[in-house]
């Protein structure tokens, strides 16, 4: 079975498992785990910040970032299909008392003018003052779309001008960095806080980082305990993340190339794929109104895909465990599954 549902499905490689088995460990809560300490040091440098904190998940990292950047009653601006908005169970409100305002995005992005238009008077006793702006890069629901560097810089500059905190949900930041041909620090370094997930393109079983200034990360360590993210001998997990930073970043270009090959092959076969959308490792396929039937037929042909926020669209995501041969098999199988469910044969 070729599993293209998500890049969260990767399995640790044999070499990563060896690194896990051989990890030096200590009490992470006492800052005595040497492997965690090394990951936090290197992770901060990788993300362009003074300090980083190791956490179990990127969702926890996002929620800690929002908690330390705002206060109850503040307003948070995000693109309306962002992970923070749709897939974190109302966390900004539940955990931090934040009012989340969704901006209408294009390809998962929004403009400085949109930010400025939503800035609320902090002196008013009637409104929630705008305090935080969050960017997601790459953008999951938009299909792995990448923010251009100049747009990132413009958003950060606007936030600085208007004294707004700015957070980067960088769950797939490494995909954006590889697509732009720049270090991750070039994208994430200008934000107040940035998160990175290790269990997607980097192929780890779990783990995430939040990075920022020393002062903010001191607050993040308190947030780590508050959210139940403090661990003990966490070096066995941090070792996987260190291995990934050494061995799995550059190879992400292979995932992107395979996604492009899949999209082009399906387009040649008459399947409705938006080629312009394929910027990283996501391919969005319009299968028509019988999406459930198309997914079932693809499974019968040995290919697993997942749904998206769009009712006629499925996604295929390339990752560490998808080979060139898998892509060619999928190119042969998917058109048969789509046409047999009556989907359109391309735009």
List each language-model region with its residue ranges.
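Conserved PLP-enzyme active-site core in the AAT-like
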Residues: 1-288, 292-301, 306-322, 330-347
